[in-house]
């Protein structure tokens, strides 16, 4: 859909302030546009009545979604849509208030009311379906085992989650088929979720929205196990092939069994199937639903439900097993530790890259610390900005500054040509250096795939030198080595663990010449162990423990799609 010639999109200021009264006392609300809400290549998908898929790329340079605070209240927060009047919530003196326009003709009057005065459809406690004994996708270490080094604290940047939301047909029906209303609500929810995760030093950017306006693409059932697995499989085999993203959630109008209103896999962020959650759209209050969305995404980041020893001050915490009567947007100390433990130990690589401004579909907001369309920099709110190069109020560079962001920016100037900006990760990955003409580090370049490495023990593959010894060490630790060739014959069985690849869900046994491109076998010589054919297998992730692509399987040969092929023709 294109805008008619001459039509002008409404202009929403980067920063605004409003004055009104709460409990008879004047308050000043300061708002800053959330410029990291949408990516530049944000796309929306819905379906025509005849079933055709319709993809649009709405303009996102200007939008009306803001974060903010109340003047003279350091603990205050706000998440507001200013599209048609002010709609959203703010916290003032530890109380949650909602604001929305009164539906009166020719009037700009608004209603302000406390959360406790909102009519609630059902007072029964609502809860997440994940139980404490529910098996993690990856084990989470005890909090006492986590320790950040000074180097890690210095160089660990913000993480960026490219978020995709899918809305089921039941939600479309509940909203009388009004797609614009649904989109506006999804933007408001994403704005709140992004604000919540900033407390964990993460940014959540909406990169896509799909509305099942002509029928669900999976069978959505009250059984959360069934629906979560179905959505995860659809995401892996369908959605990911069409749109790059890190994490997806299904928002559904169906009433899940029992008091459950959300469900997700634990420790699965970046997994092609399991980086998902499902959320019941059970409340008309955006804050309530956004907290559930943040809660389920927290599980994907390795965070378990809070126990009695966890705290986030005097507020209820995001990861409590039940949804509080007055939900807050704070993660507990336990959540922070578990999240960063998961990131540091399991390295979910998809959340390292900052999304292109063109990837974020929600409208840009100045002050959300995401660099988006129209911004030269974004260092957060004026109160929190610690970037001397950036004007936080406008998201423009200060006079005399060449840059305010990037690995090749030092003291607001481009780094000198030749300055190393990305270290070598292996002999197959040379270091990159600044050009002196840009604040960004040049693209990561690798040596050619198939080039010999590690004294001919391996061949370069996508910047790494994969060899079986290193893979055994990663799985089992020290004193573990590549097993004898006889162990690999088990891969000819085609059973639950011994195979070379999967085709249409079926495990294909290895041909004799391909056995070293299936399950990895290691010889364990560690104290108390004497296992000549040790292997790793997990129902949660069947692929883990397989020989990695590009690994040397014979002289002059490497693994490719479960075959041991000539390195000269593999790439």
From Swiss-Prot:
Active-site residues per Swiss-Prot or TrEMBL entry: 296
Motif range (D/ECD-tripeptide): 427-429
- The record places domain Peptidase M12B at 159-355
State what protein this is by name.
Zinc metalloproteinase-disintegrin-like jararhagin
Q: Give residues annotated as binding Ca(2+) 1.
A: 162, 246, 350, 353
Modification note: The N-terminus of Jararhagin is blocked.
Chemical reaction(s) catalysed: Cleavage of 10-His-|-Leu-11, 14-Ala-|-Leu-15, 16-Tyr-|-Leu-17 and 24-Phe-|-Phe-25 bonds in insulin B chain
Q: Where in the cell is it found?
A: Secreted
What function is annotated for this protein? Snake venom zinc metalloproteinase-disintegrin-like jararhagin: causes hemorrhage. This is the result of the degradation of sub-endothelial matrix proteins leading to the disruption of the blood vessel endothelium, with accompanying disturbances in platelet function. It is able to degrade von Willebrand factor (vWF) and it hydrolyzes the alpha-chain of fibrinogen (FGA) while leaving the beta and gamma chains unaffected.
- One Gene Ontology cellular component annotation held by this UniProt entry: plasma membrane
The residues of the propeptide are: 1-150
The record's annotation in CDD domains points to: ZnMc_adamalysin_II_like
Question: Which part of the chain is the Disintegrin domain?
Answer: 363-449
Q: Residue positions of the PTM Pyrrolidone carboxylic acid (Glu)? A: 151
Q: What is its main location?
A: secreted
Per the UniProt record, which EC number(s) apply here? 3.4.24.73
Q: Which GO terms describe its molecular function?
A: metal ion binding; metalloendopeptidase activity; toxin activity
């Amino acid at each position: 859909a294109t805008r008619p010639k001459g039509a002008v999109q409404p202009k929403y200021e980067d920063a605004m302030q409003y004055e009104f009264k709460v409990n008879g006392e004047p308050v000043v609300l300061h708002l800053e546009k959330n410029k990291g809400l949408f990516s530049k290549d944000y796309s929306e998908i819905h379906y025509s009545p005849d079933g055709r898929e319709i993809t649009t790329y709405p303009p996102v340079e200007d939008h009306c979604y803001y974060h903010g605070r109340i003047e003279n209240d350091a603990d205050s927060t706000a998440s507001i849509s200013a599209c048609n009047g002010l709609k959203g919530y703010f916290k003032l003196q530890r109380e949650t208030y909602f604001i929305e326009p009164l539906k009166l003709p020719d009037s700009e009057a608004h209603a302000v009311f406390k959360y406790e005065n909102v009519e609630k459809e059902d007072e029964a406690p609502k809860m997440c379906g994940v139980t404490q004994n529910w098996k993690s996708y990856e084990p989470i270490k005890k909090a006492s085992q986590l320790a950040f080094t000074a180097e890690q604290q210095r160089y660990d940047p913000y993480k960026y989650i490219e978020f995709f939301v899918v809305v089921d047909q039941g939600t479309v029906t509940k909203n009388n088929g009004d797609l614009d209303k649904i989109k506006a609500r999804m933007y408001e929810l994403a704005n709140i979720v992004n604000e919540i995760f900033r407390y964990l030093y993460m940014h959540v950017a909406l990169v896509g929205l799909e509305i099942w306006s002509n029928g669900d693409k999976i069978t959505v059932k009250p059984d959360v196990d069934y629906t979560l697995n179905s959505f995860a499989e659809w995401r892996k085999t369908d959605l990911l092939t069409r749109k790059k993203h890190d994490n997806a959630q299904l928002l559904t109008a169906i009433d899940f069994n029992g008091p459950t209103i959300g469900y997700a896999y634990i420790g699965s962020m970046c997994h092609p199937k399991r980086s998902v959650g499902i959320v019941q759209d059970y409340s008309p209050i955006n804050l309530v639903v956004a907290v559930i969305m943040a809660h389920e995404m927290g599980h994907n980041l390795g965070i378990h439900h809070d126990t009695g020893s966890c705290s986030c001050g005097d507020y209820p915490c995001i990861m409590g097993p039940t949804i509080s009567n007055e939900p807050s947007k704070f993660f507990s100390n336990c959540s922070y530790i578990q999240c960063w433990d998961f990131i540091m130990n399991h390295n979910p690589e998809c959340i390292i890259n900052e999304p292109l401004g063109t990837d974020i579909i929600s409208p840009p907001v100045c002050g959300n610390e995401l660099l988006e369309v129209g911004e030269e920099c974004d260092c957060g709110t004026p109160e929190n900005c610690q970037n001397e190069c950036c004007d936080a109020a406008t998201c423009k560079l200060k006079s005399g500054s060449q840059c305010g962001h990037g690995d090749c920016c030092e003291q607001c100037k481009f780094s000198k040509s030749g300055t190393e900006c990305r270290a070598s990760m292996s002999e197959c990955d040379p270091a990159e250096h600044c050009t002196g003409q840009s604040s960004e580090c040049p693209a990561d370049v690798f040596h050619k795939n198939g080039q010999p490495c590690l004294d001919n023990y391996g061949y370069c593959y996508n910047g790494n030198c994969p060899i079986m010894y290193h893979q055994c060490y990663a799985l089992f630790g020290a004193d573990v080595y590549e097993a004898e060739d006889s162990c690999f014959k088990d891969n000819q069985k085609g059973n639950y663990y011994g195979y070379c690849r999967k085709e249409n869900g079926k495990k294909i046994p290895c041909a004799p010449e391909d056995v070293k491109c299936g399950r990895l076998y290691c010889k364990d010589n560690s104290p108390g162990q004497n296992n000549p054919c040790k292997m790793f297998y997990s129902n949660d992730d069947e692929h883990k423990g397989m020989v990695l692509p590009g690994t040397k399987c014979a002289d002059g040969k490497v693994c490719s799609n479960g075959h041991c092929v000539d390195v000269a023709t593999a790439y």
